[in-house]
Regions:
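Secreted/luminal cysteine- and crosslink-motif detector
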Residues: 16-17, 24, 119, 479, ...
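Extracellular/secretory-pathway and virion-surface proteins
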Residues: 181-555
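Extended soluble regions of mature proteins
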Residues: 22-199
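Residue-level marker of positions within ordered structural domains that often coincide
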Residues: 7, 15, 137, 172, ...
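Generic hydrophobic-segment detector
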Residues: 10, 104-105, 455
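Bacterial Sec-dependent N-terminal signal peptides
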Residues: 1-27
Length: 555
């Protein structure tokens, strides 16, 4: 009896020791055989009760926000994710199902890792082949991710034969630092909400407009947050930009719905430079005719479209075109057509960084329409950390913008290309400009069969009198966006209006800029000229071209 009791005591004692043992495992990552030295090693603390997955930088509390720590509770295999969004802001979310849903093909292959006998299991996730090497020698389960936690202790994971995370050291420790990192109770949220908050914490969002109306009505008035001009077709808000560092990317995003207007309309997102004595804002407040006039010799006057010594035109961030009646006219039924409810427009505008960083600017949006219901839009500008540096320019110089943003306040359509002179701008550089580019956005308009909207026309750009670039702007993919266009008219030939190819735009899309290389420009006076063989008018129908140009480079 005494010996049996003694045996049970020692068995229980050894079990408690095993239960209390905590291992610390370090892992390194590699890609195509090269160790990713810039990546902090993965760190795992594991015992029979729970596992924690983090990195050495997180352990040292030197990691940039946001970052995550993963906890696996045993024996339930519940995954608790902790997101550190910013200093003092931590959230968590439990997941009791994901580990149990994992499936593996167990193989007979074996190998040794750090002296431990390991077996291989294989799984596929989102078309990726994952090989997991695990051991049962440690008598506990764990690993550098949640993958394979039910197999044993994972010491190596290989993805698609080119990406590898492998254990480099294993040791027993008496205690961990986890209580110094996760302190006290942490608020919990559902998994979808957790992922959304974590994702949004990875970048900076500047909220410009939230479900604002752009319409045509005498009742459209400014308020303390948003200014409205031209009977509500233009909305403006002053936005303070933070310092935007090298390597950070900037995106503009618009979400648009019809609020009564069924037609495809020209839209633009712009900002107003205030680097000269006169700006586009003066025209909004005092009238278009207070802005500098451009005369091409056709008898018309075009206000505020070209830069002068004392005036900078509005800089176009994004040109977009509304779809035919999205959301408001989704009651129109066609068999096999499930209409989209929102038109999303999103564009990288990182090249404009030098004119945005640490500036307080008027940001505006315009949709040309004469409808009292008009359109609803939301506008965000987001700033993202990135290792990708595509645009290295430190200079942004606005040269021209012929899009008649103040159309409903008397600004004429851009029909100046009916003369050979076209658009002509003179500008002066105070310093040499290296790697100069013209950021050029162009769309042709005139919505009848012979109008320039539906007739390809060459755009030719001349620098200091010499043609430097010529191309035919044309979009032939408009039919791809049919489901955004419920109110698009249908023709006897089986096509719909939104299917038709156009001069560089489609209903429901963004028009991308062209980046035209100009080489190195010396300090002094230069000229830019744009020529387009604009089609002749027919009765009351006429063609026009909306072109905007910004000079980029480094000084």
């Amino acid at each position: 009896m005494y010996k049996k009791a003694l045996f049970n005591f020692f068995a229980l004692f050894l079990c408690c020791i095993a239960y209390a043992q905590t291992y610390e495992i370090q892992y390194t990552s590699s890609s195509n055989g090269k160790v990713l030295t810039e990546q902090s090693p993965t760190l795992v603390w594991a015992n029979a009760k729970e596992n924690f997955i983090l990195t050495n930088k997180i352990r040292e509390q030197k990691s940039d926000y946001p970052y995550e720590i993963t906890k696996v509770e045993k024996p339930s295999n519940t995954v608790v994710s902790y997101a550190f969004l910013k200093l003092g802001d931590i959230i968590s979310s439990p997941d009791a199902e994901s580990i149990g849903k994992q499936s593996f093909e167990l193989t007979n292959e074996t190998k040794k890792i750090l002296g431990y006998s390991c077996k291989k299991a294989v799984t596929k996730i989102n078309s990726n082949t994952i090989e997991v090497w695990y051991t049962n020698d440690l008598k506990i389960n764990g690993g550098p991710s949640v993958l394979g936690q039910s197999l044993g202790f994972v010491l190596e994971i290989e993805r698609n034969k080119n990406s590898l995370i492998t254990a480099t050291s294993i040791k027993q420790v008496k205690k961990t630092d986890i209580n110094a990192i996760i302190k006290g109770s942490v608020p919990s949220t559902d998994l979808l909400g957790y992922r959304n908050l974590l994702w949004k914490s990875r970048f900076t969002t500047l909220k410009v407009f939230d479900n604002e109306t752009i319409n045509f009505s005498d009742e459209s008035k400014s308020n303390e947050n948003v200014k409205k001009f031209a009977n509500g077709t233009i909305i403006l808000k002053k936005i303070k930009f933070p310092a935007i560092k090298e390597g950070e990317n900037i995106f503009v995003e618009v979400k648009q719905q019809s609020n009564g207007d069924a037609y495809d309309r020209t839209g633009t997102v712009f900002f107003i430079p205030q680097d000269k004595t006169s700006s586009f804002f003066d025209g909004l407040e005092k009238g278009a005719k207070t802005l500098p006039v451009y005369d091409n010799g056709n008898g018309k006057q075009y206000y505020g479209v070209t830069a002068t010594e004392n005036y900078s035109p509005a800089i176009e961030m994004m040109r977009f075109f509304t779809a035919f009646g999205i959301q408001k006219f989704n009651h129109i039924q066609l068999k096999g057509k499930d209409w989209q409810t929102v038109s999303p427009y999103r564009q990288d505008i990182t090249e404009l960084k030098p004119s945005l960083s640490e500036k307080e600017l008027w940001i505006g949006a315009f949709i040309g329409n004469y409808d009292k219901g008009g359109h609803k839009i939301s506008l965000d500008i987001t700033i993202h950390k990135s290792d990708q540096t595509v645009y290295k320019n430190n200079t942004v110089i606005p040269l021209f913008n012929t899009l008649n943003i103040m159309e409903m306040a008397g600004q004429d359509y851009s029909t100046m290309f009916d003369k050979d002179k076209g658009l002509f701008v003179e500008f002066t550089l105070k310093k040499d400009l290296k790697n100069a580019q013209l950021r050029y956005i162009t769309t042709g308009h005139g919505g009848w069969e012979n109008g320039d909207e539906f007739v390809p026309k060459a755009n030719s750009v001349f620098l200091d009198g010499k043609m430097t670039f010529s191309f035919v702007p044309w979009r032939s993919d408009c039919g791809s966006y049919r489901l955004y266009n419920p109110a698009s008219g249908n023709f006897p030939d089986g096509l719909s209006s939104s299917d038709l190819s156009r001069s560089n735009w489609c209903p429901g899309t963004v028009t991308n800029p062209n980046f035209i290389p100009l080489g190195d420009l010396k300090a002094g006076t230069h000229t830019i000229q744009v020529k387009i063989p604009q089609g002749a008018s027919e009765g009351t129908s006429f063609s026009s071209w909306n072109v905007s140009g910004v000079l980029l480079g480094s000084q």
